[in-house]
Amino acid sequence: MRGAPGIGSATVRNDTPMAIVLVDAENVRRSTWPNIGKDELERLCAEWAHARGHDVRVIWETNEIADDRIAREVRELDPPIWIVTSDRELRERVRDHAERIIGGGSFARELRA
């Protein structure tokens, strides 16, 4: 890791995103009780991204499985890329390309802090 600030650390905003953060939406949504609603997760991620200057992309299941999309995008996008998931299989698939992998529960708690 190249000295990237951790979750919750203060950063100076600028026009360049510090990292592209790919969020495994269903994994994060279901990581706390009560579960985070879809709209609430989108709103919280947008607020978190704005406050920290990151480009956060919340990935939902569509015609492409979310895990497959995240694994593909982490290879295609320019670093630094952070992945938010607690899914062991997905973590294995992205570990060589992600600068940082954040657990879904940790991220959900940070969003609600």
Please give the residue ranges for each predicted region.
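Nuclease catalytic cores that cleave nucleic-acid phosphodiester bonds
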Residues: 13-113
